[in-house]
């Protein structure tokens, strides 16, 4: 067998039907679109319209709601505060507040609207005695700060 002797099986490769190429082709004149009307024109597809039956979007029930009292937190890790202390961007003598964290660039708090929560992910040791005034703390973060001799205001 040679490469020039290879061929497709019979019926494996079929030419597609060319529509709207004369009445003798079997799909001529209107090209399978019917006569007149919106759907016979080019470029028309009515999104969500299912031919008069109730659309899927109306058949499915409404679900859930957006709670207006949900609190949105900016998350900060103890590791990031410790790194800022080492870099000299924060001072251990000062009380660390939301405004101070924004000023240093540890959090992005537009219009001072969001609350700040301190977490202790990947931090098992924390040695700096800090005084912090933030909105929320994880239980592990509280324990680490108190163990280091810090204060939560």
Curated annotation (Swiss-Prot):
Quaternary structure and partners: Part of the 50S ribosomal subunit.
Work out whether the entry's keyword set contains Protease.
Answer: no
- State what protein this is by name: Large ribosomal subunit protein uL15
- What role is this protein assigned? Binds to the 23S rRNA.
Q: Name one GO biological process term.
A: translation
User: Domain of life of the organism in this record?
Assistant: Bacteria
Where does this protein have compositionally biased stretches of type Gly residues?
23-35
Report the GO terms under cellular component. large ribosomal subunit
């Amino acid at each position: 067998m040679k490469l020039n002797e290879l061929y497709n099986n019979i019926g494996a490769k079929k030419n597609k039907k060319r529509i709207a190429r004369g009445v003798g082709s079997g799909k001529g004149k209107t090209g399978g679109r019917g006569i007149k009307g919106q759907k016979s024109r080019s470029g028309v597809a009515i999104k969500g319209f299912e031919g008069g039956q109730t659309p899927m979007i109306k058949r499915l029930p409404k679900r859930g709601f957006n709670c207006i009292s949900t609190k949105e937190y900016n998350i900060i890790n103890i590791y990031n505060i410790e790194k800022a202390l080492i870099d000299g961007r924060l001072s251990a003598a000062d009380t660390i507040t939301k405004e101070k964290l924004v000023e240093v660039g540890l959090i992005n708090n537009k219009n001072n609207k969001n609350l700040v929560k301190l977490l202790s992910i990947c931090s098992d040791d924390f040695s700096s005695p800090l005084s912090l005034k933030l909105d929320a703390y994880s239980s592990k973060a509280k324990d680490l700060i108190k163990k280091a001799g810090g204060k939560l205001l």
